[in-house]
């Protein structure tokens, strides 16, 4: 088995926070969030990272992240391009939004030759997640089922006090595998806990704080790439007429289909670390403070890549 590699999705642009979160400094020496994820990933055993970016941010991204990380890891780049579509499809007029997380991973298909983990560039996951992910990918291969995994977080460790968040709410089977993941696009905190709405706030449903949620930290075998690629044209045929400018091909969509078809089992690994991210501009000081605290406590050196 080839060693697991890490795929970092870094082509998006923050719609709520504004700007390029993936290269916005949060550390004492100008480090960005993904520096800390990569440091944790390297300690866990990952040696190769594939950044999925856009051509237009290539120079800025390499200067901000890629060049210094290359001192410690084997760094590769893949480019998520709007016009990378199956034969017979064209980019709808006026479309600028990327095609989603599944499309981002497919951009790296030719660089992946074994098991791989997927993360967002602008989420802080904590060291525990990378340890359990690397260990799982290193010891499991596809058998009669595709053997995949994901790392879940406690909902209360992933919410923002500054506004609503979107999270994949997970339901697990008794054996710890994933039954379903449902995207809740408006989850908010309130005085009694956490709740979500699906009708613009007309009604709300409470969610327990220990509900497992997905933060897009997935572990797949190479088989996933073929499945995602084969399904893309059908997804476009179904979704382009309904929402040509904003529909997105998400990873959980393919995962759910594979579970329902009985092709895959996804082991739900768990992290009790607190997630950090900049969903809103007001979240950034909290991230800076958390990184400063972890650095002072010795979890990270001041200079990660010295």
Task: Set out the residue ranges of the language-model regions.
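Short beta-strand-to-loop acidic/aromatic patch adjacent to the donor-nucleotide binding site
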Residues: 114-124
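Conserved alpha/beta core of the MobA/IspD/sugar-nucleotide pyrophosphorylase nucleotidyltransferase superfamily
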Residues: 172-174, 181-306
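N-terminal glycine-rich phosphate-binding loop and ensuing alpha1 helix
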Residues: 2-66, 75, 80, 114
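Conserved core of the sugar-phosphate nucleotidyltransferase
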Residues: 127-215
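Short phosphate-binding loop-to-helix
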Residues: 69-114
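A glycine-rich helix N-cap at a beta->alpha junction
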Residues: 64-83, 141-146, 157
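Short, surface-exposed amphipathic charged segments that create phosphate/polyanion-binding patches used
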Residues: 87-98, 163-168, 282-286
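A short, conserved beta-strand element in the Rossmann-like catalytic core
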Residues: 14, 124-126
């Amino acid at each position: 088995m080839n060693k697991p590699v890490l795929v970092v999705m870094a082509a998006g642009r923050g719609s709520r926070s504004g700007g390029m979160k993936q290269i916005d400094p949060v550390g004492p020496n100008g480090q960005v969030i993904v520096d800390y994820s990569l440091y944790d990933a390297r300690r866990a055993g990952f040696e190769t990272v594939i950044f999925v970016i856009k051509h237009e941010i290539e120079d800025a991204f390499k200067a901000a992240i890629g060049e210094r990380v290359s001192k410690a890891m084997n760094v590769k780049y893949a480019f998520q391009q709007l016009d990378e579509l199956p034969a017979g499809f064209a980019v709808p007029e006026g479309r600028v939004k990327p095609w989603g997380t599944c499309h981002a991973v497919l951009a790296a298909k030719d660089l992946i030759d074994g098991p791989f983990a997927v993360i967002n560039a602008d989420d802080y996951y904590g060291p525990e997640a990378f340890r359990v992910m690397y260990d799982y990918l290193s010891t499991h291969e596809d058998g009669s089922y595709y053997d995949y995994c994901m790392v879940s977080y406690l909902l209360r460790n992933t919410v923002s006090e500054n506004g609503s968040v979107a999270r994949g709410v997970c339901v697990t089977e008794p054996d710890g595998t994933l039954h379903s993941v449902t995207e809740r696009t408006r989850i908010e905190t309130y005085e009694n806990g956490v709740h979500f709405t699906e009708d613009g706030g007309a009604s709300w449903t409470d969610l327990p704080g220990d509900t497992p949620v997905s933060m897009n930290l997935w572990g797949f075998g190479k088989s996933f790439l073929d499945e995602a690629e084969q399904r893309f044209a059908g997804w476009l045929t179904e979704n382009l007429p309904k929402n040509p400018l904003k529909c997105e091909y998400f990873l959980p969509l393919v995962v759910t289909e594979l579970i329902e078809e009985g092709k895959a089992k996804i082991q739900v690994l768990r992290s009790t670390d607190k997630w950090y991210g900049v969903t809103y501009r007001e979240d950034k000081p909290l991230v800076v403070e958390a990184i400063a605290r972890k650095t002072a406590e010795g979890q990270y050196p001041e200079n990660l890549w010295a």
